Structures are given as C-alpha cells and as structure tokens.
C-alpha cells in the first residue's frame, strides 16, 4: 500500500447528497488508483444538528455505491480532548490568543467597517493583550500573519493566492470550549496523514487559513483539489426543487448503483468521448487533473439512459433479487408466480428503472388481469373468438414451450388459418397481458408457462362469449 491517504468527511446533518457522493467517489477512485488508503470521517462537531439517523443514511449511501473505506468511520465528537491539546499548544507558543471581545462589540465594529467601505474583519483588539482574565468569557483566535501571500496549486483550479492582510484571525475555540470547523479539519487531516484533500469548491476560501494552521503546527500541507458544484437545469445550485438530491432516493426510484457511480463521475470528469465506464475502468482511467473547472449540470435524462444501459447489461438473476422489494411494495409475492429471472429477461430491454420493471411485471403475477378498455374494445372482438379458442388448443398440444418452439407453433398456426400475425398478435397480447404494450409474445408465453397461458386465453374466450 502506498503512502497516499484520502478521506471523505461528511457532516451528519442530512442524507448523502449527490454532490457529496461525487466528492466521495473522486476520493475513493484516487485512493484505489494509487494503491492508497481511503478514510471515512464523520464531522459531527455541530452537536445540535448532527443526528445518528443522518450518520446511518450516509453510511448506507456509501455502502450502496460500493465505496468501501479502509479506516474509520472516525467521529470528531470523540476527539475533543485531542483538539484541546492543540489549542493549548498554540496558546503556549504564542501562535494563538484569547479574545474577550463580546458579540455586541464585534457587531458594532463590523457595521462601522461596512459604513466606511472596509472589508469587515477582526481588528486585532485582543491580539497583543498583556493581561489575561480567566473569569471573563473568551474565544481563542489563531494569530495569522498580516503580511505576505498564502498560495497553493489546486489540482483542478490551478494556482490560487490570497493576500494575508485579507485573512482574519480565525476563531479556533468558542466560548463554550468547543473547537471550530476550520481548526478541527486541519488537526484531523494532519494527524491522520491525509496527503490529498478533494472537496467542494465552496471550501476554497477556507484553504489559506487552513494552510497557515498546518504551517504553524509544523505539519506538511496536503495537496488540494476543489471540485466545482453541481447545478440544476436552470444553472442554479442543485436542490430539492430540481427533484431528488439524495443518493438513496435514486435507489428507491429504481436506479442501479453502477449507473449512479458512472453518471456522477462523468459529471465533471471525462476521458475522451467515452460514456460507459465499469468500476475497474474508472479506477484505471480516473485522474483528478481531468476534472473540469466549471460546474456540472445534473441531467436526469442522461442518468436514465445510463441506468437503462446497465439494466440491459445486468444478469436477470441479480435484477430479480433487486426487484423483489419493488414488487412487494405493489402487493405482489413473486414466489407465487412465474420464475422472476425469466420475467426480468422479458422486461430488460424496455425498462429504464426497476420501478418501470416492477410495474411492467405486475400482469405476470395477477391471476385476474383487467383488460384495458380501449385495447379490449379494439382487439377482443367476436371475430377473434374462434382464433383464440383454436390457439389455446394448438398450444395445449405444443410439446416445446421454449422461445423457438413457440415461434414455430405460432407460425404454423398462422399459416393454417391463412391470416397475418397482425390479425392475431394484439388479441393475444390483451388476453395474456391486459393491454397491447407488452414484451414479445413468445417471451411472455414462455415466462407464463403452458398452464397459465392456456388459462388466460380461455378466460379471454369466455369474456368474448358473454
């Protein structure tokens, strides 16, 4: 295993968002490509908003996507003593100081700066205080340099530089003794030996402050890669108003994990004109430098196209297993009807999602299918009664109920009757499936089996005889 170490560090304040999932994927792929270590860390310092339910949802989303982690999950809430040690160390070294300014004082100074057209930032009132008052509430601030430039070479965005005079003296510990995000993320990444930080580009402005903390603590600065955000079709940040944003919502909508992985990685990264990538392809071909600088637009139609591809490519046995809960939601027990893998085989070419497949499979498992009124009125007419009755007799005598055997039997029947397939096919579809939109007739008959096929044909004959 190489020394490369990457991490995904979500906050457990909600579900695993598609943007977070893509960030996790990029980290996972780079770790796997370089033979490194992928670490999962839960950033739960916001105790009021963090929930176990969210932790469970994040872990479930990671597992569904197949993003296995090598270390963790680590929880920041369990590391508070570690953070306090580093705060004390910075205080002892004069690299941090206690600030006694009240929120009211800070707000007044902020408003004054705005009035004067200055950028609001901490004015350093307590930066060089000689006397300390342990009885007064205080925060701890990092003593940032006010001169020079802090720059880094972003693996996606290129060189980014900040004038240090623009940077605040960052609060690293609140009045209640809890550490702040920008501080703990540095301590965690430093002590966990993270070598590359891949995260959303909303963190770019945090980076110079974090680099200064690394340097003050004497730790090597990792490489940074800031991933552009994901937008909705209207070019605004992807949110619930654009549709589902939770990874697990897409699972529940009948998407396959490999389709979601393929889609999310391609949303911002490319390798020539290729669209379809297996997991192994992605591990071999992915580079963070090939991620685009501009935001990606989430396209549900493209995801549907990919999902359809993977449904067509998957084994019927695997899809059957995944389909069971969708059928049960619809009141169907698939163990009571035809072979589910056989049914799946008839629906793979037509189904873009497992939801569509489950809906398309219902007629196989309902003993008393209802006929579509328009289709029945058009195709279940008196003239088809003798044809359906004769077909039932023909199939009853058919010894080979395989696809090829059924095709031969139907062709023979049509020739015997001197008709065209179009005069028979729609009536058979309505009889067996309830409507004319269905898989191929031979596939349906083969999946239903002889007994059920004959029962449905004879039921249609009885319907016509009424």
From Swiss-Prot:
Residues given in the record as ATP binding sites: 240
Organism (species): Geobacter sulfurreducens (strain ATCC 51573 / DSM 12127 / PCA)
EC number: 6.1.1.17
Family per similarity comment: Belongs to the class-I aminoacyl-tRNA synthetase family. Glutamate--tRNA ligase type 1 subfamily.
Reactions accelerated catalytically: tRNA(Glu) + L-glutamate + ATP = L-glutamyl-tRNA(Glu) + AMP + diphosphate
Cystine pairings recorded for this chain: none
Keyword flag 4Fe-4S: no
Record's function text: Catalyzes the attachment of glutamate to tRNA(Glu) in a two-step reaction: glutamate is first activated by ATP to form Glu-AMP and then transferred to the acceptor end of tRNA(Glu).
Record keyword Ligase present: yes
Chief location bin: cytoplasm
Alphabetical list of PROSITE patterns matching this protein: AA_TRNA_LIGASE_I
Alphabetical keyword list: Aminoacyl-tRNA synthetase, ATP-binding, Cytoplasm, Ligase, Metal-binding, Nucleotide-binding, Protein biosynthesis, Zinc
Full protein name: Glutamate--tRNA ligase
GO cellular component, one term: cytosol
Chain span(s) of sequence motif 'KMSKS' region: 237-241
Obligatory cofactor(s): Zn(2+)
């Amino acid at each position: 295993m190489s020394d490369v170490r990457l991490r995904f560090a979500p906050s457990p304040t909600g579900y695993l968002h598609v943007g977070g999932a893509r960030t996790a994927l990029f980290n996972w792929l780079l770790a796997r490509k370089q033979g490194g270590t992928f670490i999962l860390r839960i950033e739960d310092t916001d105790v009021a908003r963090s929930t176990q339910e969210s932790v469970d949802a994040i872990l479930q989303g990671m597992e569904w996507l197949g993003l296995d982690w090598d270390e963790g999950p680590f929880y920041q809430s369990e590391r508070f003593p570690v953070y306090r040690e580093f705060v004390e160390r910075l205080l002892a070294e004069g690299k941090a100081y206690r600030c006694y300014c009240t929120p009211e004082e800070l707000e007044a100074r902020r408003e004054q700066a705005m009035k004067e057209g200055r950028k609001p930032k901490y004015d350093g009132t307590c930066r060089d205080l000689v006397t300390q008052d342990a009885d007064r509430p205080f925060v701890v601030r990092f003593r940032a340099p006010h001169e020079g430039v802090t720059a880094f070479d972003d693996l996606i965005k290129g060189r980014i530089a900040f004038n240090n005079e623009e940077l605040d003296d960052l609060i690293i510990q609140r009045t209640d003794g809890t550490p702040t995000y920008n501080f703990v993320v540095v301590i965690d990444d430093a002590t966990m030996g993270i070598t590359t930080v891949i995260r959303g580009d909303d963190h770019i402005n945090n980076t110079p402050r974090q680099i200064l903390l690394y340097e003050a603590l004497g730790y090597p600065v990792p490489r940074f890669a800031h991933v552009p955000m994901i937008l909705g079709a209207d070019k605004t940040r992807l949110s619930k108003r654009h549709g589902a944003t939770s990874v697990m919502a897409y699972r529940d909508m009948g998407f396959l994990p490999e389709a979601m992985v393929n889609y999310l990685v391609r949303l911002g990264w490319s390798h020539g004109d290729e669209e379809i990538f297996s997991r192994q392809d992605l591990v071999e071909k992915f580079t963070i430098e090939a991620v685009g600088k501009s935001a990606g637009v989430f396209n549900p139609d493209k995801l549907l196209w990919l999902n359809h591809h993977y449904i067509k490519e998957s084994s019927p046995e695997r899809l059957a297993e995944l389909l069971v809960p969708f059928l049960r939601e619809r009141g169907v027990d698939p163990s009571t009807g035809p072979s589910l893998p056989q049914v799946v085989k008839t629906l793979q070419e037509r189904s873009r999602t497992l939801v569509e497949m489950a809906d398309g499979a219902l007629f196989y498992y309902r003993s008393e299918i209802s006929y579509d009124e328009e289709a029945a009125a058009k195709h279940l007419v008196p003239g088809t009664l003798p044809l359906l009755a004769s077909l039932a007799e023909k199939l009853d005598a058919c010894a080979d109920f395989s696809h090829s055997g059924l095709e031969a039997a139907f062709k023979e029947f049509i020739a015997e009757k001197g008709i065209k397939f179009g005069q028979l096919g729609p009536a058979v579809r309505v009889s067996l499936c309830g409507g004319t939109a269905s898989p191929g007739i031979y596939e349906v008959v083969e999946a239903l089996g002889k007994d059920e096929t004959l029962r449905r044909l004879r039921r249609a004959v009885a319907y016509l005889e009424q």
